[in-house]
């Protein structure tokens, strides 16, 4: 366990753990914004943006599973680490990792099979369905990586390594920001 968590003042710890997490979330927001800028500049940009909007509800559901296992498991692991029950903490982390992988696979399979029907249920029209399906299928390819990077990041943070956690998300976000620039421009 990180000794800082046991010895430093709470106010200093709070800032040192919160600021990197806030910055990581801001960078994540930035790459979502950049996606929309690139897509909005397409020939049918308005329809494509509407397609992304339809996928937002599905992505929120995927994020809920990520948070279930990441945000749900990290405090339990943190409590175990604080009680010097490292074996218990390792079991919690392993179970959450496995749950993230399994839920990713199930989500991907379900959405590849029923994605079109779900998008129609969420209000897709003939004009927006193809854009929504394309975006969703591309997003699904990275679902397992997104769930693992975000979900396991909570465990990095709960051990007191918020700067490292921020760097992992910033690295992923930077890659996501630069690839469209390289591939689309």
Predicted segments with their positions:
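Hydrophobic/aromatic residues within transmembrane alpha-helices of membrane transport systems
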Residues: 23, 35-39, 52, 77, ...
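Generic alpha-helical transmembrane segments of integral inner-membrane proteins
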Residues: 22, 26, 30, 34, ...
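Interfacial/gating helices of multi-pass transporter permease domains
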Residues: 39-60, 127-131
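Residue-level signal for short hydrophobic patches within transmembrane helices
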Residues: 11-30, 58-65, 141, 167
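Conserved small/polar residues in nucleotide/adenosyl-binding loops
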Residues: 175-181
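Hydrophobic/aromatic residues in alpha-helical transmembrane segments
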Residues: 35, 73, 114-115, 152
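Short alpha-helical transmembrane segments in multi-pass integral membrane proteins
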Residues: 1-18, 77-144, 177
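Small-residue-rich hydrophobic transmembrane alpha-helices
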Residues: 49-109, 146-165
């Amino acid at each position: 366990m990180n000794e800082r968590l046991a010895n430093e003042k709470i106010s200093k710890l709070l800032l040192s753990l919160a600021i990197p997490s806030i910055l990581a979330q801001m960078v994540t927001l930035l790459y979502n914004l950049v996606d929309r800028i690139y897509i909005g500049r397409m020939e049918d940009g308005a329809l494509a943006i509407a397609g992304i909007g339809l996928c937002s509800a599905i992505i929120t559901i995927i994020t809920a599973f990520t948070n279930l296992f990441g945000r749900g498991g990290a405090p339990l692991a943190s409590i175990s680490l604080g009680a010097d029950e490292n074996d218990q903490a390792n079991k919690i982390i392993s179970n959450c990792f496995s749950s993230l992988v399994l839920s990713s696979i199930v989500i991907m399979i379900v959405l590849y099979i029923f994605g079109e029907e779900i998008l129609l249920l969420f209000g897709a029209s003939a004009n927006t369905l193809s854009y929504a399906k394309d975006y969703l299928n591309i997003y699904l390819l990275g679902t397992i990586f997104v769930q693992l990077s975000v979900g396991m990041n909570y465990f990095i943070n709960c051990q007191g390594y918020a700067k490292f956690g921020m760097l992992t998300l910033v690295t992923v976000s930077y890659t996501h920001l630069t690839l469209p620039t390289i591939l689309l421009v």
